[in-house]
Design a protein with these regions (language model features):
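A short, polar/proline- and glycine-enriched secondary-structure boundary/capping micro-motif
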Residues: 55, 77, 88, 99, ...
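Glycine- and aspartate-rich repeat motifs characteristic of hemolysin/RTX-like Ca2+-binding segments
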Residues: 39-41, 50-52, 100, 111
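Bacterial N-terminal signal peptides
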Residues: 10-18
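N-terminal, post-signal-peptide region of Sec/Tat-exported proteins
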Residues: 46-81
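Long terminal segments
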Residues: 2-6, 12, 24-45, 120-174
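Surface-exposed, polar helix/loop patches in the mature regions of secreted/periplasmic/lumenal proteins
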Residues: 85-144
Length: 174
């Protein structure tokens, strides 16, 4: 009985930690999240300077939400499966983010506010959608969708903006 108590405590802590949002408020921190399954959700929030967040999900009907406030942040989100949704919001200067999805009927949303930000969306499969919004000057974004039935919405305001949208490429054959 005494040996089972630490194991039960560790398992309950692991279960609790998998649903608690991740938050940091310093500089040069890194958060890495890797999740498999069905109907899971990841929520991360970072405030500070030069922070990194990397999240990966495999499965279906999953969601990722990341929020970064400050400067020089990096967000990388990858999802594999179907009916998944991912979004990240970044505010500040010189932030960058990448959102990649492979599968069917996935949705991606990026919102960046500030100066000198960079955003990228890559989707492969069928029926995926992407929405990107950048407010601020001297920012760039790119959307690449490979497969059929995709939708993309790109909104940029201010000056010095660069955007690239590529849609409808056939699936690559190796």
């Amino acid at each position: 009985m005494k040996r089972r108590a630490p194991i039960a405590a560790a398992l309950s802590f692991a279960a609790f930690a998998s649903i608690v949002p991740t938050a940091t408020a310093q500089s040069q921190n890194l958060v890495i999240i890797d999740q498999d399954g069905f109907k899971s959700e990841i929520s991360g929030s970072q405030t500070g300077y030069q922070l990194s967040l990397s999240a990966k999900q495999r499965g279906y009907e999953q969601g990722i939400r990341a929020i970064q406030d400050g400067a020089r942040h990096v967000a990388t989100i990858r999802q594999y499966g179907r009916d998944n949704g991912a979004a990240f919001n970044q505010s500040g200067r010189r932030n960058s983010g990448f959102l990649g999805q492979a599968g069917f009927y996935n949705s991606a949303a990026i919102n960046q506010a500030g100066r000198g930000n960079l955003a990228g969306v890559a989707q492969m499969g069928r029926g995926n959608s992407a929405s990107t919004n950048q407010t601020g000057s001297y920012s760039a974004l790119g959307v690449v969708q490979v497969g059929d039935g995709h939708a993309a919405e790109v909104t940029q305001s201010e000056r010095g903006e660069v955007k690239l949208v590529i849609q409808g490429l056939n699936l690559f054959r190796w």
